[in-house]
Amino acid sequence: MSVRERRAVVATGLIAGLALTATVASCGASQHDSKQVVLQIGAIPDQNPEKLNRLYGTLSEELSEKLDVPVRYAPVSNYAAAVSAFRTGSLDLVWFGGLTGVQARLQTPGARVLAQRDIDAEFTSVFIANGASGLRPFTSADQLVELKGRRLAFGSASSTSGRLMPQFFMGENGVKPEDLAGGGPGFSGSHDATIAVVQSGAYEVGALNEQVWRSNVADERVDPGKVSVIWRTPPYVDYHWVVRPGLDERFGDGFTNKLQSALLDLSADTENGATILELFGAERFIPAKDEDYTM
């Protein structure tokens, strides 16, 4: 699949997701004092809070040292809250998925994409199944039709890799949400929670971010006797950093470019850099632009 085709696929999915997703939930991060020059960073809560606090706490320390400004991580309660906090100015820099990043930029004129991981240009989701479901690995996408009548869990409704793109590929192969058991999917709230509900047998099938799946397997949080991958999606573009406009006015000329460079310069050669990149499941960050997430 060419880069143009991948962008077309994700753009089609994003358009569908924007039509299906509720506009905005209330913000979980408190708005900071506009007189206090603090760079507020955030992220969609796609994994367990303990891991996110460690990751973004370490990143805040690293960025503060490199940029010589106070940097604070402000967690939010859900995906919509991340978009809302970015729109209102409570967050200056946010790690979004494909769908939430588009939502954030549409609601915040002048916001722009700064960077993505080396794995985000060709990202994939996986469908996993509980062993008792009787489902075996699919050899082609048209076998997704076997999901009809099954109990299936997505992560967040606003997740690109945990709902939007898996649902897009299901639809391409004749499976509508109402075809699932109970008349629709369940929502676990995050990728690691999807693993948990499928492994426990609460759901027969789940769809999630492949990087989180691999990380949980490596950390031995997955019982291979109870749950396994049955299908991997084609690649698409996904996660990325989005920055608000006006940071140069608050922090000084050229600050936004310095911020981008600080992200791109993260290296496994330093202790903090190695920790950050490992927790992100990446080897490095690479430049990205708005056009990567549109037609």
Question: Could you describe each region identified by the protein language model?
Answer:
Residues 58-68, 156, 160-187, 215-222:
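Ligand-binding cleft/hinge of the Venus flytrap
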Residues 73-84, 97-99, 177-196, 235:
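Short helix-initiation/N-cap motifs at beta->coil->alpha
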Residues 33-140, 210:
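Short, glycine-/small- and polar/acidic-enriched structural segments
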Residues 117-175, 179:
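A conserved helix-loop-strand patch within extracytoplasmic ligand-binding domains
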Residues 95-108, 171-172, 197-200, 204-225:
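A ligand-binding cleft/hinge motif common to bilobed small-molecule-binding domains
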Residues 36-42, 47-58, 236, 242-243, ...:
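An extracytoplasmic/periplasmic, membrane-proximal ligand-sensing/linker region
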Residues 24, 28-31:
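Bacterial signal peptide processing site
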Residues 111-120, 180-184, 217-235:
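Short beta-strand->loop
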